[in-house]
Amino acid sequence: MAIAQLATEYVFSDFLLKEPTEPKFKGLRLELAVDKMVTCIAVGLPLLLISLAFAQEISIGTQISCFSPSSFSWRQAAFVDSYCWAAVQQKNSLQSESGNLPLWLHKFFPYILLLFAILLYLPPLFWRFAAAPHICSDLKFIMEELDKVYNRAIKAAKSARDLDMRDGACSVPGVTENLGQSLWEVSESHFKYPIVEQYLKTKKNSNNLIIKYISCRLLTLIIILLACIYLGYYFSLSSLSDEFVCSIKSGILRNDSTVPDQFQCKLIAVGIFQLLSVINLVVYVLLAPVVVYTLFVPFRQKTDVLKVYEILPTFDVLHFKSEGYNDLSLYNLFLEENISEVKSYKCLKVLENIKSSGQGIDPMLLLTNLGMIKMDVVDGKTPMSAEMREEQGNQTAELQGMNIDSETKANNGEKNARQRLLDSSC
């Protein structure tokens, strides 16, 4: 019964899809380094300046100071300050020394910076939800296939070495010829139709991801230019005047002779806002050329990452470059960004350095001495250690011993029953 249960467990375990113990590629970067830098600066700087503006407001306690008559109590002076601060956005209640100016921009300056920060975060947010999942799945497939290509090359190199060793050991010509032909077929089968190469070539005719990428970069550039225009206009506005005249004669105070017709008011935070606008403007002006550079990054047509794989026979025909803007140019950039996750690249980079040193060493000969990259985790199977194999062997031996003991006891029981029957008949 125990043997049948163990056999059933082994049979059904082959049909079950086991979950991988840990992900093969952890921490894939789905955003280019230059794009992430632009996002952090463009979004983080306004938020930092907003925090400074609100800290200044908390420390000072008021954003406006109106010069009330000495006969006014502190409550009446506070009412004048509150009334004129609330009337900043009303053009008919305010009159500046330089004419009618939109002084409400001073009041809403921190909130406009917050608006630009939100707008600049929208393109990365769109990229994260619209394009990043597709790129993540494709990158995992491509990097996994690159490791498999490396493993196939090692198998082929070792099979060729075994062929040479058997040629020296075998003296029968017919057997040697048949063996060499079979090994050559196995080696050649490793190099037929590399799927990763064919898959990358299909991306030359695809423009879906590159359109999303260029759209996000263009939208970021437009928002930064609009922010620069606003900050420049605000700086020129704040440099004209931060003082204005306010009238509170309305309602029941219209005919009150004790209330002055006009009050001279001054916006206290304009100087701080002017400094913050200059800082933000300078940073955005310096950031705009970087955003323009990101538009032309996919046009570089770099395939340096895959060039190291040309050492392998599988990649002898991998001599293609992206022409213009297409998804292939974008995948090359993201492969370069995540190349540290590809183990086969590190091994082949060592072989390339040895080959370029001019020592005359055949890279294919070195492949026979390299270890294969474990792909069991990707397939959902964990490699069985020696201790687990020994434990399973012990369990099998115990089950066999239990089976033998049960058969021995059954035979002894039958013999005892026969003996009792013979004794009773006598």
Swiss-Prot record:
Compartments reported by the entry: Cell membrane; Endoplasmic reticulum membrane
Transmembrane spans: 41-61, 107-127, 218-238, 267-287
Segments for region (Disordered): 405-426
Glycosites: N255
UniProt GO BP: ATP transport; calcium ion transport; cell-cell signaling; monoatomic anion transmembrane transport; monoatomic cation transport; oogenesis; positive regulation of interleukin-1 alpha production; positive regulation of interleukin-1 beta production
Catalytic activity: chloride(in) = chloride(out); iodide(out) = iodide(in); ATP(in) = ATP(out); K(+)(in) = K(+)(out)
Record key words, sorted: Calcium, Calcium channel, Calcium transport, Cell membrane, Differentiation, Disease variant, Disulfide bond, Endoplasmic reticulum, Glycoprotein, Ion channel, Ion transport, Membrane, Oogenesis, Phosphoprotein, S-nitrosylation, Transmembrane, Transmembrane helix, Transport
Topology in the lipid bilayer: Multi-pass membrane protein
Extracellular side: 62-106, 239-266
InterPro entries documented for this protein: Innexin, Pannexin
Entry GO CC: bleb; endoplasmic reticulum; endoplasmic reticulum membrane; gap junction; membrane; plasma membrane; protein-containing complex
GO molecular function: actin filament binding; ATP transmembrane transporter activity; calcium channel activity; gap junction channel activity; identical protein binding; leak channel activity; monoatomic anion channel activity; protease binding
Biased composition (Basic and acidic residues): 415-426
Domain of life: Eukaryota
Expression sites by tissue: Widely expressed. Highest expression is observed in oocytes and brain. Detected at very low levels in sperm cells.
Site (Cleavage): D376, V377, V378, D379
Predominant cellular place of this UniProt entry's protein: membrane
Effect on the protein upon substituting N255A: Impaired glycosylation. Forms gap junctions by 2 hemichannels
Modified residues annotated as S-nitrosocysteine in this record: C40, C347
Phenotype for W74A: No effect on voltage-dependence. Altered anion selectivity with equal permeability for iodide and choride
Pfam family, one: Innexin
Substitution effect: I272V: No change in glycosylation pattern
Positions on the Cytoplasmic side per record topology: 1-40, 128-217, 288-426
Subunit structure: Homoheptameric.
Disorder this protein is connected to according to its UniProt record: Oocyte/zygote/embryo maturation arrest 7: An autosomal dominant infertility disorder due to oocyte degeneration and death, which may occur before or after fertilization.
Protein name as annotated: Pannexin-1
Organism of origin: Homo sapiens (Human)
